[in-house]
Amino acid sequence: MLYVVGIGSGNERHFTKEAEEILNKVDLIVCYKNYKKFVERLNKPIYTTGMTREIDRVDYALKEAKDKDVALVSSGDATIYGLASLAYEINAVKGYNVDIKVVPGITACSLASAILGSPLNHDFVVISFSDLLTPLETILKRFRCALEGDFVICIYNPLSKRRKEPFLKAMEILAEFAKDKDYIIGIVKNAGRNKEEVVITNFKDLYKNLEKYLEFIDMNTILIIGNSSTKIINGKMITPRGYLDKYKI
């Protein structure tokens, strides 16, 4: 059996009870090398690979799962930019016929939203700015459509030291929409981990101080761009559900 397990931020308190139980019972844990530190406490054999070796990692986990219980670990939730879909694909393409069970985890957008206040309390869109697997033009088209629809937008993988173009082009698009209104932006770096940092600002500040933010934002950062209703209440970023517009209190 292959268990595809989401471990949230990796912090022990963000492991679900089910994830903890599964990881304690399996024979082998397979994960990205930087996540090894999150599961070493379980005292299980661990197999790791580096960045861009996802196919090798998943294939190895499936082969091992033919005759033992294996946990394939993803940060956050394995079905949200995680390895769950790849496990199902490889299992089918290679005809392994391994039983697969996905164990949900706390995804970064949910965790970041709670840290910021409640910015995802109405309709929202999640977009990854990584163009390793998705063409840049597709990313930017989706981003523009989300702005046109007045969705709150949660951005994964906003930029890295070598990959700034998607973020910069997206900010140019956002600047077009910000001519007549400003956007509240929440930034959470290392959500739920050591050295967690939180910034609530607005687009005008971000765009004016872009170089500073380019140094601050990285692949471990979540950006949440508010919609036209998003506001700051007592220092927290809030997107109202609409109750007070409809009901008197």
UniProtKB/Swiss-Prot annotation:
Pfam families: TP_methylase (PF00590)
InterPro entries: 4pyrrol_Mease, 4pyrrol_Methylase_sf, 4pyrrole_Mease_sub1, 4pyrrole_Mease_sub2, Cbl_synth_CobJ/CibH_dom, Precorrin_MeTrfase
Pathway(s) where this gene product acts: Cofactor biosynthesis; adenosylcobalamin biosynthesis; cob(II)yrinate a,c-diamide from sirohydrochlorin (anaerobic route): step 3/10
Reactions mediated catalytically: Co(II)-factor III + S-adenosyl-L-methionine + H(+) = Co(II)-factor IV + S-adenosyl-L-homocysteine
SUPFAM superfamilies noted in UniProt: Tetrapyrrole methylase
Annotated keywords: Cobalamin biosynthesis, Methyltransferase, S-adenosyl-L-methionine, Transferase
NCBIfam families the record matches: cobJ_cbiH
Family membership noted in the UniProt record: Belongs to the precorrin methyltransferase family.
Known function: May also convert cobalt-precorrin-3 to cobalt-precorrin-4.
Protein name in the entry: Probable cobalt-factor III C(17)-methyltransferase
